[in-house]
From Swiss-Prot:
It comes from Streptococcus mutans serotype c (strain ATCC 700610 / UA159). It is found in: Cytoplasm. One of its GO terms (biological process) is chaperone cofactor-dependent protein refolding. This is Co-chaperonin GroES. Heptamer of 7 subunits arranged in a ring. Interacts with the chaperonin GroEL. The keyword Disulfide bond does not apply.
Amino acid sequence: MLKPLGDRVVVQLKEEKEQTVGGFVLAGASQEKTKKAQVVAVGEGVRTLTGELVASSLVQGDTILIENHVGTPVKDDGKDCLIIREADVLAVVND
């Protein structure tokens, strides 16, 4: 299992259903510019200039919303994941 450093977060993308309109699959450019992911692991947080640790506001299991272009793809226990910075998280989704 990966242990992210600092403000980094390991996430696994959630499968999204294909968007259709009247039975036609929408082209990639027409689809959402965001995607949902589940938090797999969270770094310890970041340090301020005075050395104080500011912990992450995310916890393992959170469902989050991120932009399509963020993250570094990695494999974790054979699963496709992304490593992102906490600042790249747009929102926490309450299911």
